Amino acid sequence: MKSFYHYLMKYRHPKPKDEISHFANAAYEDHSFPKASTDYHELSVYLELNGDYLSSMTTFDEAFEQYDVEVKKK
């Protein structure tokens, strides 16, 4: 199964147009991001402690919900 990080990278953009693209660009630069994780709780805890680049955890929640629908439910 594709990790959340791998899924999120499809939203990277040199000129981000939305919060998820900003999140994807920042996660790419975050060398400690749990790149192999598919677990909401693990990612959420990591971002609450280290995700100062997120303007709101709602951005993560929305991205993870899309990931859950598109990848995990297949």
Swiss-Prot record:
Transmembrane segments: none annotated. InterPro entries: UPF0346, YozE_SAM-like, YozE_SAM-like_sf. Belongs to the UPF0346 family. This is UPF0346 protein BPUM_1890.
